[in-house]
């Protein structure tokens, strides 16, 4: 500071509020303060404070405070069953795929059939995890790619077996016996 003292806590400098830890290091991101949780951008400028229980909107991002604590690095399920996930800064994930789940634009984990970017996916209705490999859904067998989670349409060889999926993704498995020979309709 101008007086030569170590800057600690919220300090006004040239009309802008900054936050410094006990070692005088300027902090950025979401910081718990005596007034609630205050967001400081990468330059240290104060962006606003949230402090009410439940949902809070700040700079276009949603945060959730429960029992006085902001939810971070966790999942949260509302009373109506919607599941949300918050990152390390407390920001609700939205409109992205993260750790095997799709998050809607509204932030909830999508379940069941999902159509994104021209491909079909399926997320388990209980865990919200996007399915991979062979799955039987409503009595129909499907195959979902292990790396990008997309439902197979067309054909692919997996573990020495030819998988054929029609335009709806319904799978037929063909065992390849040897070069030029195949057994259709069974494993």
Which residues make up each language-model segment?
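Extracellular adhesion/carbohydrate-binding repeat motifs centered on closely spaced tryptophans
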Residues: 1-187
């Amino acid at each position: 500071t101008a007086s030569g003292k170590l800057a600690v806590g919220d300090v006004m400098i040239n009309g802008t509020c900054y936050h410094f830890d006990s070692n005088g290091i300027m902090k950025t991101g979401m910081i718990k303060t005596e007034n609630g949780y205050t967001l400081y951008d990468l330059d240290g400028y104060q962006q606003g404070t949230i402090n009410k229980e439940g949902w809070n909107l700040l700079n276009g991002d949603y945060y959730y405070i429960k029992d006085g604590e902001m939810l971070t690095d966790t999942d949260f399920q509302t009373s109506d069953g919607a599941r949300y996930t918050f990152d390390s800064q407390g920001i609700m994930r939205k409109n992205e795929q993260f750790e095997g789940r799709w998050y809607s634009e509204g932030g909830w984990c999508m379940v069941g059939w999902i159509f994104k970017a021209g491909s079909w996916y399926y997320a388990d209705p209980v865990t919200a995890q996007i399915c991979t490999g062979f799955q039987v859904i409503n009595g129909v067998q499907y195959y979902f790619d292990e790396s990008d989670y997309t439902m197979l349409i067309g054909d692919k060889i997996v573990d020495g077996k030819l998988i054929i999926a029609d335009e709806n993704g319904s799978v037929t498995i063909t065992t390849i016996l040897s070069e030029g020979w195949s057994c259709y309709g069974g494993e």
